[in-house]
Amino acid sequence: MLPRDELSAILTAATTFVCPSVYEPLGIVNLEAMACGAAVVGTATGGIPEVVDDGVTGRLVPIEQLQDGTGTPVDPERYVADLASVLTEVTSDPEQARAYGAAGRERARDEFSWDAIADTTRALYAELTA
């Protein structure tokens, strides 16, 4: 595992970050990439769509999965082709990738930073105890 400062430097230098997970409860790794300003290409599964706003902070790759709990694609070749297509789309348009990265950084800060989480938690507690 890389030290945090090295990982941050790599993600900050990256134009695009790819997360081809077939199972991801939330996808902290995507938030880390977004916080560093990288456009994210991730699988539309689990919690990834709650982090990556398709067409705003990056792109989501569609996936049809077996219903056995493994996350295995029904058609692995189709999933790989879709992943390659979306990745090519993002990396072929550096201006759009930068826009995704900037929007992702803003979303990570505004919605997922510790300050944002604390504000949301305080507001919820205030509402529940009012």
Question: What are these model-derived regions, one by one?
Answer:
Residues 89, 110, 114-130:
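C-terminal alpha-helical cap of glycosyltransferases
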Residues 39-42, 52, 59:
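Short hydrophobic beta-strand element within catalytic cores of glycosyltransferases
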Residues 9-14:
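Short alpha-helical donor nucleotide-sugar binding micro-motif in glycosyltransferases
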Residues 27-30, 48:
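Short glycine/serine-rich donor-binding loops of glycosyltransferases
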Residues 15, 37:
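A short alpha->beta transition loop at the rim of the catalytic pocket in nucleotide-sugar-dependent
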